[in-house]
Amino acid sequence: MVQRITVIGAGSTGHSAAAYLTQRGFTVTSHDDSRFSSRFEDISRLGGITLRGEAHGTFMPACLTTDPAQAVHKAQAIFVHVMADRHEEIARRIAPYLEDGQHIVIVPGNLGAFVFRSVFREMGISADVTLTEKEGNLCPCRLTAAAEVTVGLPIDAEGRAASLPASDTGRVLEALKGVVEYVPNRNVFEGVINAGNVTNHIASTLLAAAEVDRRGDDFSLFKYAFTPAAVHCITKIRLERQAVIHAMGMQEHENPMDMIERVLNLKEHPEVATFYEYMNGPNSLDHRYLHEDCGCGGAFAVSAGKRLGLNCLF
């Protein structure tokens, strides 16, 4: 069974993953580059990563390091929790130190496995490692203080994933049992086409652009963006994406409108109160809600739809 895990990424999800896996008894190394050294210093100074909201406790990873060689050495699984625009950077950073038998899991996938594979081939990496993408993220969360992350919905070790190539999926998921309990997607495309952020983030952010500019750090998509007109637009986008999914011979995994409906009806859905209250953002239009969700899932959905002969307008 996998015991030694490296979590790459010192953002909110990286903090959550490192604390969560430490809580469950794994030997966790938390890694990012020197730009994030102050965050590791905060964790050391404060005695660990504090989880608040829908997770609780303070947990100290076994190792905090900005050294990629130290981070990768002897890791059985490497979970990559960074935005898609950092995938190439991370691939180049860890490539020289990879060892046979390691499993690299990209969360969320966003077709990052293709980037990692391309970099490894370019650099002539011969280590026998696997590349796997999880559909969606570990949990919604935000850094709310030094070494503190507020989790908006319960952290869940379940989900869907696929490897690149897909023929590796079965053995990877078997190796990761006890760490995560993923069920297999057909391939990495099934994961990215089903990403909920494509429908919920892009249209609502664009339609709320003026309010984002006005409120800045005080803006919350879930408090201010889901107006009737925005919800109508998101519904249309969901239907267009459904058509692409079906044309690909796949099924929609979840109704992305469910979360919006819960947020708009808080009295009937107290389970999303923490999510609603603390998951702020975007604070500007230069934000992952646009450049990541448009550039990954959105662009893929449009491209796939066009190749399949559909008239994709979203």
Task: Give the location of each predicted region.
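Rossmann-like NAD(P)(H) cofactor-binding subdomain of soluble oxidoreductases
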Residues: 84-145
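NAD(P)+-binding Rossmann beta1-loop-alpha1 motif at the extreme N-terminus of oxidoreductases
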Residues: 1-53, 72
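Long, low-complexity C-terminal extensions of enzymes
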Residues: 262-314
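Small-residue-rich helix-loop
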Residues: 230, 236-278
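Substrate/ligand-engaging "lid" and interaction regions
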Residues: 138-233, 237
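Rossmann-like NAD(P)-binding element
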Residues: 57-98, 105
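Nucleotide donor/acceptor-binding cores
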Residues: 2-3, 129, 157-159
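A short helix-to-beta-strand connector/capping loop
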Residues: 54-63, 125-131
